[in-house]
């Protein structure tokens, strides 16, 4: 899920809105690079539009969160997907030190998510069977 198109928005909790380099050319390159993955599908829309349009889709088994990087937006997305996550679903969060990951982890605990692994810039949470 990524609209691309050089949109101006607030990228981080403590930064003003600005335009980054997420161009349509980058989108084209991504689609070409991932074209051999038959199950890959890019939704070139905002996360809010995706959640409004595809609210009936579930269950999800894997979600990679790679933007936005504001705590409130990541939290909104994480809870939305957690409500639709199947058992053993994994959530991978990119650049997690840039937002309030402890808050997000805490919010996901009632859904059964526990930390599986954490590195310098990525963290993986997994939904355990029966919230164990």
Model-derived features: where do they sit?
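S-adenosylmethionine/decaboxylated-SAM
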Residues: 1-132
């Amino acid at each position: 899920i990524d609209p691309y198109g050089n949109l101006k928005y607030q990228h981080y909790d403590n930064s003003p809105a600005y335009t980054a380099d997420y161009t349509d050319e980058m989108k084209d390159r991504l689609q070409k690079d991932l074209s051999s993955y038959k199950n890959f599908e890019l939704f070139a829309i905002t996360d809010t539009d995706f959640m409004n349009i595809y609210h009936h889709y579930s269950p999800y088994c894997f979600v990679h969160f790679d933007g936005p990087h504001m705590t409130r937006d990541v939290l909104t997305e994480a809870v939305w997907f957690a409500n639709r996550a199947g058992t053993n679903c994994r959530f991978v969060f990119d650049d997690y030190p840039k937002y309030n990951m402890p808050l997000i982890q805490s919010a996901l605990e009632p859904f059964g998510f526990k930390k599986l692994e954490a590195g310098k810039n990525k963290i993986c949470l997994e939904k355990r069977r029966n919230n164990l």
